[in-house]
Amino acid sequence: SLSDKDKTFVKAFWGKLKGKADDVGAEALARMFGAFPATKSYFAHWPDLSAGSGPVKKHGKIIMAGVGDAVDKIDNLVSGLSKLSDLHATKLRIDXXXXXXXXXXXLVTLAANFPADFTPELHVSLDKFFAAVGAALSDKYR
């Protein structure tokens, strides 16, 4: 679970990241498609899955808005992300394991874009945060 220290690290880093969130989201999404090709199946209707394509940029922005929402609700992710969890489980029917693939791509993207900030301590805190977000998003699957 997230300690107070983890929450402090995540909130502080989000403050630095916010201005580049849309670009980071598109890059992380494109990275996920390359590293985890099975995730492309949810977006087969998009002709271009690169970070520069319109649909990837748009969805990257949506994802990062969700991450920002999770940061705001970091003290109660299951309740705070309940509607998003329901959307993923019932309407979009996204495999809950895809969250782990998205988290791995996001961590690599964040490390590449913020090398000076991406300390081992931040890495651990972000990893725990993304795991908690993934668990909250998969809550409606149970």
Swiss-Prot record:
GO terms for biological process: hydrogen peroxide catabolic process. Heme b binds at H88. It comes from the Eukaryota. CDD domains: Hb-alpha-like. GO terms for molecular function: haptoglobin binding; heme binding; metal ion binding; organic acid binding; oxygen binding; oxygen carrier activity; peroxidase activity. SUPFAM superfamilies: Globin-like. Red blood cells. Acetylated on Ser-1. Heterotetramer of two alpha and two beta chains. This is Hemoglobin cathodic subunit alpha. It comes from Ophisurus serpens (Serpent eel).
